[in-house]
Amino acid sequence: MKNRTALLMAVMVLTMSCSLLAQAPKAPATVTSVLDRSLSGMEGEFVPAAEAMPEDKYSFVPSTGEFKGVRTFSQQVKHVAAVNYLVAASVLSEKPPVDTGGENGPDSAKSKADIVKFLKDSFAYAHKAVATINDTNSVSDIKSPFGEGTTTRLSMGVLLVGHGFDHYGQMVEYLRLNGIIPPASRQ
């Protein structure tokens, strides 16, 4: 009987301990965590969309309607990756670690594999930059990556996410015009 009572008490203590641990308050959100989570969310939709388009369709551009001068699918992907690098480098106050080819991506990235690698590497670099944005430096002036003037780290962190989603929306149309359901819509 004593063993049963001791066992019952041990189970109750463990259960209560687990309940208390499960109810522990979450750490408050920070500028860094919010930006990183947002960037991860965008990356989680953008990269699979880039991977979903077959390589032979990477040069696709809509042709019916008013689409003169719009980017091809590969140019969309390269542009977002290049801007990721430029913006992240601005946040880090350094030069991009790779040739970005300006805002259009490097001419050397031609195959789907090269372009997707350039894209994934740009997101890794963007996460590195976002990790440095905090309450202390988020609104400090930094040099704008787009010419003269200044901006803030926070605005550049927001731009990383917003810019990617802007082009993601265009890429979704390119995918659908080719009979491909975007990966994020398949779930």
Predicted stretch roles:
Residues 107-144, 152-164:
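Acidic/histidine-rich alpha-helical segments that form the ligand environment
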Residues 54-58, 92, 135-138:
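Short, flexible helix-adjacent loops and helix caps
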Residues 23-31:
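Cleaved targeting-peptide boundary
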Residues 36, 40-47, 59-103, 143-187:
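Short, contiguous alpha-helical
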Residues 8-19:
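Bacterial N-terminal signal peptides
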Residues 1-5:
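Positively charged n-region of N-terminal signal peptides that target proteins for export
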Residues 45, 49-50, 88, 125, ...:
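Well-ordered alpha-helical scaffold segments within catalytic/enzyme domains
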